[in-house]
């Protein structure tokens, strides 16, 4: 199999691997989103909160994603910065039904955007306004306003309304992210 891998790489058939950081507060749906992006035969049936981080892989039409699913629990968020240097893209997940913690999500986003390993890089950021199926959720436009996303001028970003359990909105986001990554790589 190693020979076939090398041959496909030489012919340009091998998918480019990209490292993506999946960030957001605890219980926002990060692990559920990443699980749903994997092929159905590789998906976990039981999703448990991530402790520290986990590494997951999935493929799109032209890229191979290695995703660092980072715990969003308060005591683990300081670990995020150790992975910033190697991240080529960021998925930031927001629980759109949790208006009370939107302020905390904004604080964490601001900390991320101002970190020296992120601040001066044109790294694409995909925002999933998750849990749109819940009655108390706010629209992705409102999430964008609450997080002041329009103030992000030096990085490409996109926000998608999503329902991780049903998989709604996820493909739109991955397609956008893939386009952004390929634009940087070419």
Curated annotation (Swiss-Prot):
A lipid is attached at residue 2 (N-myristoyl glycine). InterPro entries: Arl6, P-loop_NTPase, Small_GTP-bd, Small_GTPase_ARF, Small_GTPase_ARF/SAR. Keywords: Cell membrane, Cell projection, Cilium biogenesis/degradation, Cytoplasm, Cytoskeleton, GTP-binding, Lipoprotein, Magnesium, Membrane, Metal-binding, Myristate, Nucleotide-binding, Protein transport, Transport. One of its GO terms (molecular function) is NAD+-protein mono-ADP-ribosyltransferase activity. The lineage of its organism: Eukaryota, Metazoa, Chordata, Craniata, Vertebrata. This is ADP-ribosylation factor-like protein 6. Mg(2+) binds at residue 50. It holds the Pfam family Arf. One of its GO terms (biological process) is brain development. Disruption phenotype: Isoform 2 deficient mice present a disruption of the normal photoreceptor architecture. It is a peripheral membrane protein. GTP binds at residues 24-31, 50, 69-73, 130-133, 164.
């Amino acid at each position: 199999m190693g020979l076939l891998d090398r041959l496909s790489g030489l012919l340009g058939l091998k998918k480019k691997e990209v490292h993506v950081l999946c960030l957001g507060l605890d219980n926002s749906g990060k692990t559920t989103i990443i699980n749903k992006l994997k092929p159905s035969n590789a998906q976990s049936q039981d999703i448990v909160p991530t402790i520290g981080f986990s590494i997951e892989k999935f493929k799109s039409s032209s890229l191979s994603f290695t995703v660092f699913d980072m715990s969003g629990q308060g005591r683990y968020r300081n670990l995020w910065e150790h992975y910033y240097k190697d991240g080529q893209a960021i998925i930031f997940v927001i629980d759109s039904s949790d208006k009370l913690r939107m302020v905390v999500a904004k604080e964490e986003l601001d900390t991320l955007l101002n970190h020296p390993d992120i601040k001066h890089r044109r790294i694409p950021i995909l925002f999933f306004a998750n849990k749109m199926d819940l009655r108390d959720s706010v629209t992705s436009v409102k999430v964008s306003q609450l997080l002041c996303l329009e103030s992000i001028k030096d990085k490409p970003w996109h926000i998608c309304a999503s329902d991780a359990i049903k998989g709604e909105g996820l493909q739109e986001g991955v397609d956008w992210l893939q386009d952004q990554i390929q634009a940087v790589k070419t």
